[in-house]
Curated annotation (Swiss-Prot):
Name of the molecule in the record: Inhibin alpha chain
Impact reported for R60L: Found in a patient with early-onset epithelial ovarian tumor; uncertain significance; alters the ratio of secreted activins and ihibins
Compartments where located: Secreted
Gene (name only): INHA
Annotated propeptide span(s): 19-61, 62-232
Lineage: Eukaryota, Metazoa, Chordata, Craniata, Vertebrata
Role this protein plays: Inhibins and activins inhibit and activate, respectively, the secretion of follitropin by the pituitary gland. Inhibins/activins are involved in regulating a number of diverse functions such as hypothalamic and pituitary hormone secretion, gonadal hormone secretion, germ cell development and maturation, erythroid differentiation, insulin secretion, nerve cell survival, embryonic axial development or bone growth, depending on their subunit composition. Inhibins appear to oppose the functions of activins. Inhibin A is a dimer of alpha/INHA and beta-A/INHBA that functions as a feedback regulator in the hypothalamic-pituitary-gonadal (HPG) axis. Inhibits the secretion of FSH from the anterior pituitary gland by acting on pituitary gonadotrope cells. Antagonizes activin A by binding to the proteoglycan, betaglycan, and forming a stable complex with and, thereby, sequestering type II activin receptors while excluding type I receptor.
Pfam family, one: TGF_beta
Phenotype for A257T: May play a role in premature ovarian failure
Site (Cleavage): R61, H62, R232, S233
Any single biological process term in GO: cell surface receptor signaling pathway
GO molecular function terms noted in the UniProt entry: cytokine activity; growth factor activity; hormone activity; inhibin binding; protein-containing complex binding; signaling receptor binding
């Protein structure tokens, strides 16, 4: 609340018309913003004459991580995720009813596992997938196997019968095998049910929980389809010709007085402009908003109160005592903080600090 009043008083011009007039001078706004930062963070550490916290430039490994070129939009972070799927079959080596069938399959070196990819996984693009299988074999046993026949083979059930799944063996810890599915086989994880048949003549069926096989799928958001890209690239239709459209284009510009009502003013401020680029190293700049304008609109006596939770409009005073004159100011409770990264030793160490209640979100006549 103290910062609310301070911001309100600092950004109020002197004189009787406290909420009206032209936009504030940039130098005045910078001075008030500098006072708000010093009130919240305190003065920067002085390491030499002149009040500059060091002259050594920020190392590139720190500077490149947070700075962006002015005028460039920050790149959107790619939506990637990883899913781990375990077999959904109820049969195991400990089930007496299924022990005979599983034992027969194990004797033949064939292991059957059913996976059920989630709706989230099926709705995304699978970029890679690996099947982790506990072979129980050490590297010596693997090397001693018959080299004329592959140690592991992978099949997938389809309506037409089992089909071979292209894969390659990757690096794995002892007693395990990691099968990397080829790109052409990644579409298998888009089906609701995936049944894999793994052929390993030297492997045995294990009922230990830590030996349960599993699938690891890496996914990302699907790229837009061709039709969606075409819709995005289709130019907007031209404005239909009509006399009303012509009159709208030929109308004179609005007077400055039309924007004199209470509104939020935006100002891009860089810390280099404030002289603190060696103290506050990130962000390099921020958008500062303050409230400005008049509240001279006629207010009917039967005006209903604003809806709770919704910011009032300039024509609806937030709170007005009898005989008091409304003034354009930030709506209490809607101010947001600004998080900054500071250094006091020229970039050897950093500190993350917060300037509370600095960014104005809503303005109202109060």
């Amino acid at each position: 609340m103290v910062l609310h009043l301070l911001l309100f008083l600092l950004l109020t011009p002197q004189g009787g018309h406290s909420c009206q007039g032209l936009e504030l001078a940039r130098e005045l706004v910078l001075a008030k913003v500098r006072a708000l930062f010093l009130d919240a963070l305190g003065p920067p550490a002085v390491t030499r004459e002149g009040g500059d916290p060091g002259v050594r430039r920020l190392p590139r490994r720190h500077a490149l991580g947070g700075f962006t070129h002015r005028g460039s939009e920050p790149e959107e972070e790619e939506d990637v995720s990883q899913a781990i799927l375990f077999p959904a079959t109820d049969a195991s080596c400990e089930d007496k009813s299924a022990a005979r069938g599983l034992a027969q399959e194990a004797e033949e070196g064939l292991f059957r596992y059913m996976f059920r990819p989630s709706q989230h996984t099926r709705s995304r693009q699978v970029t890679s997938a690996q099947l982790w299988f506990h072979t129980g074999l050490d590297r010596q046993g693997t090397a001693a196997s018959n080299s004329s026949e592959p140690l592991l083979g992978l099949l997938a059930l389809s309506p037409g019968g089992p089909v071979a799944v292209p894969m390659s063996l990757g690096h794995a810890p002892p007693h395990w095998a990691v099968l990397h599915l080829a790109t052409s086989a990644l579409s298998l994880l888009t089906h609701p049910v995936l049944v894999l048949l793994l052929r390993c003549p030297l492997c045995t069926c294990s009922a230990r929980p830590e030996a349960t096989p599993f699938l690891v799928a890496h996914t990302r958001t699907r790229p837009p389809s061709g039709g969606e890209r075409a819709r995005r690239s289709t130019p907007l239709m031209s404005w239909p010709w009509s006399p009303s459209a012509l009159r709208l284009l030929q109308r004179p510009p609005e007077e400055p007085a039309a924007h004199a009502n209470c509104h939020r003013v935006a100002l891009n401020i860089s810390f280099q402009e404030l002289g603190w680029e060696r103290w506050i190293v990130y962000p390099p700049s921020f958008i500062f908003h303050y409230c400005h304008g008049g509240c001279g609109l006629h207010i009917p006596p039967n005006l209903s109160l604003p809806v709770p939770g919704a910011p009032p409009t300039p024509a609806q005073p937030y709170s007005l005592l009898p005989g008091a004159q409304p003034c354009c100011a930030a709506l209490p409770g809607t101010m947001r903080p600004l998080h900054v990264r500071t250094t006091s030793d020229g970039g050897y160490s950093f500190k993350y600090e917060t300037v509370p209640n600095l960014l104005t979100q809503h303005c109202a006549c109060i």
